[in-house]
C-alpha cells in the first residue's frame, strides 16, 4: 500500500497519452471507413475532384452551402447545420432525413462506424470538436 500514491500518479500521468492514442486510432479508423463508404463521391478538399461536395470543414457548416456545388432545392432550403447528430442521421438514412436530396441512399446504420467517420470528419474541421458520445 505504500506505493499506492506512486501507482496512482503514474496512472494519472498516462491517462492523457492513452486518450491521445485512442483518439488517433479512432480518427485513423474513421479515415479508412470514410475512404470505403464516402470517398467514391466525396473528397476531403476542393483540390481533389469529386462528384459530391468536399467534406473538409463540414462539421457545423450549413447544409447546402458549399460554394459552387449544385445542391437540391430541398437541401439548400433546409436550414440544417451539419452537427454530429445531423450527420449521423444523414449517414443512417439520408433519403428519410432529407427527402428530395440528390445523394443516393447510403444507409450506414452501424453507430460505431458512424462514430469513427464522425471522428475523422471532426479531425478535418477547424473547430475544437470534442469526442462524439451519446448523440
Identify the role of each PLM range.
Residues 1-9:
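Sec-dependent signal peptide recognition
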Residues 9-19:
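Hydrophobic h-region of N-terminal signal peptides that target proteins for export
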Residues 13, 35, 43, 60, ...:
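Residues at helix-coil transition
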Residues 17-35, 44, 132:
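Electrostatic cytochrome c docking/interface patches
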Residues 20, 83-133:
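C-terminal capping alpha-helices of c-type cytochrome domains
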Residues 27-31, 43-83, 105-107:
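Gly/Gly-Pro-rich "capping" loops immediately C-terminal to redox-active cysteine motifs
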Residues 36, 50, 66, 98-100, ...:
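Extracytoplasmic
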Residues 40:
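Short, cysteine/histidine-rich loop/knuckle motifs that typically chelate Zn2+
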Amino acid at each position: 500500500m505504500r506505493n499506492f500514491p506512486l501507482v496512482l500518479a503514474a496512472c494519472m500521468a498516462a491517462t492523457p497519452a492513452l486518450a491521445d492514442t485512442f483518439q488517433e486510432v479512432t480518427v485513423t479508423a474513421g479515415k479508412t471507413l470514410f475512404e470505403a463508404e464516402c470517398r467514391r463521391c466525396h473528397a476531403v478538399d476542393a483540390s481533389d475532384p469529386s462528384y459530391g461536395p468536399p467534406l473538409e470543414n463540414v462539421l457545423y457548416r450549413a447544409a447546402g452551402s458549399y460554394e459552387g456545388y449544385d445542391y437540391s432545392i430541398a437541401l439548400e432550403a433546409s436550414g440544417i447545420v451539419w452537427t454530429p447528430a445531423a450527420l449521423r442521421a444523414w449517414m443512417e438514412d439520408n433519403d428519410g432525413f432529407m427527402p428530395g436530396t440528390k445523394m443516393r441512399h447510403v444507409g450506414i446504420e452501424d453507430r460505431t462506424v458512424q462514430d469513427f467517420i464522425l471522428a475523422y470528419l471532426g479531425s478535418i474541421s477547424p473547430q475544437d470538436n470534442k469526442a462524439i458520445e451519446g448523440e
